[in-house]
Amino acid sequence: MGKVIGIDLGTTNSCVAVMDGKTPKVIENAEGMRTTPSIVAFSDDGERLVGQPAKRQAVTNPERTFFAVKRLIGRRYDDPMVEKDKKLVPYKIVKASNGDAWVEADANTYSPSQVSAFILQKMKETAEAHLGAKVDQAVITVPAYFNDAQRQATKDAGKIAGLEVLRIINEPTAAALAYGLDKAKAGVIAVYDLGGGTFDVSILEIGDGVFEVKSTNGDTFLGGEDFDMRLVSYLADEFQKEQGINLRNDKLALQRLKEAAEKAKIELSSTTQTEINLPFITADQTGPKHLTMKLTRAKFEALVDDLVQKTIEPCRKALKDAGLTAGEIGEVVLVGGMTRMPKVQEVVKQLFGKEPHKGVNPDEVVAIGAAIQAGVLQGDVKDVLLLDVTPLSLGIETLGGVFTRIIDRNTTIPTKKSQVFSTAEDNQNAVTIRVFQGEREMAADNKVLGQFDLMGIPPSPRGMPQIEVTFDIDANGIVNVSARDKATGKEQQIRIQASGGLSEADIDKMVKDAEINAAEDKKRREAVDAKNHADALVHSTEKALAEHGAKVEEPERRAIEDALSDLREALKGDDAEAIKTKTNTLAQASMKLGEAMYKQQAEADAAKDAAKDDVVDAEFTEVDDDKNTKKSA
């Protein structure tokens, strides 16, 4: 299995990370940057540009440069937010045949999922260049307030990009994973995530590997793009007052204004004044016109104050839903580039009554969390499990790779169900509980959700320990998975809430797949033990035949080779009975080979003993040849 990568598919920038051993690592792109602009463009000759190259040419090619397309993903054309977006961007937003909002360039239309897929492909290529291996699986993050259509559209983007999306997880939850993975101290945190296009706030309780989402709230159309556009509007208004020219009618000028606004916004986070200087922004009959303007931090904050204030109400709602006061929040984690703005930090401090935590990189923390979740799914990271309530069966992997259901699909929640399992080997002191979701008989054919270990089982014969595995789903959709050794009372459990998951299409596909393959699954299940035993016998017989075949009579040797060939052929299929029959035939035929091996060993031992008896002690004289050595010049 190749590496599973974690991708933060952002409105303004995207980021990719991967687990490097036990540590998540952000991967630099071909341009040497740790984040990639979420921009796709088509040049005059039809070449597709993604990331920094697309951003560099945006000013001269505004109508074919798509940015902030994440705001359109999963939205209908008649959505009020789409109507608002149409007035803000220089590229064309059109109505698709299915009623969705798509984008258009040179008479070609693209779905937002398709444009997002181009960005995901760039992330995929970045990871492959770093790892030196093919990558085809990923965990992708989405805003916590994304609806089902938006989540599914994001998953579709992954598929178009050639990625199997193992999990869609919430951005604040991913950030909490990155923040809290190595924190020993339990507590309640708030994740305040103000990114390029969306705002989310989540309240989480963290402790002992448990990441429990208490509440979430947000706005999927509030972010850095709105701050940029507010400044663009101000610059256009000021220029019109001075020069009498409306720059909004000039798409090229508008794109230059947007770039300048973004740059000024970033600069004003670290300085109190900046200058915007755009020579030759436009021209009239009197000649070229230039835009030069000083902008103070105070003026910018006044322009966007209502946008910052819009983040307060979702925070209050999230606190109320969690049943907590601002004073009960132990730490406020800032996520998203916009949280670098001093005004935003000030509002957060006033609201929660404490300085926000600035120990994580707001541009990278979400991708890092996605990489951690990818590590969980791969088994590289343990004691962390993000679970959603699902209409598919929940169970664990047992001996032979079999999927043993504990809670069947369509079980009404809240529910709690336990099942007792045992060890597979003598003196086994630990068991790994691998949790799966699906309808197939073999665990590998289902979706792995995570794993954890139950340690400290007293040494005893296999099959003797009684390990009770319990799945507990409450009315809030929070899943508890625990394993308890009934003899010692030792227990290990994980509880996590996340709101990603499988779409209806995925569920339908898995159920239909299970129905179609039911008979085959049953045969494969029965064949597991038979195949394991047969494989071991084939290997040992081949080795013995190569070493001792000459000691066996020709007819017996031929019988062994025929039986070996028959069993190899049977192993190509999944007929358990045929494999068992051929295994028995080979076992009988190879008995003569075993006799020859024992006979040869006995003869070798006898020869060794005889040689020992024939050893004669001898005297020897040491000769020093140095005296006779001739020296030459």
From Swiss-Prot:
GO terms for molecular function: ATP binding; ATP-dependent protein folding chaperone; unfolded protein binding. SUPFAM superfamilies: Actin-like ATPase domain (SSF53067), Heat shock protein 70kD (HSP70), C-terminal subdomain (SSF100934), Heat shock protein 70kD (HSP70), peptide-binding domain (SSF100920). The keyword ATP-binding applies. CDD domains: ASKHA_NBD_HSP70_HSPA9. Keywords: ATP-binding, Chaperone, Nucleotide-binding, Phosphoprotein, Stress response. The keyword Cell wall biogenesis/degradation does not apply. InterPro entries: ATPase_NBD, Chaperone_DnaK, Heat_shock_70_CS, HSP70_C_sf, HSP70_peptide-bd_sf, Hsp_70_fam. Induction: By stress conditions e.g. heat shock. The modification Phosphothreonine is found at residue 198. Belongs to the heat shock protein 70 family. Acts as a chaperone. This is Chaperone protein DnaK. It comes from Rhodopseudomonas palustris (strain BisA53). The lineage of its organism: Bacteria, Pseudomonadati, Pseudomonadota, Alphaproteobacteria, Hyphomicrobiales. The gene is dnaK.
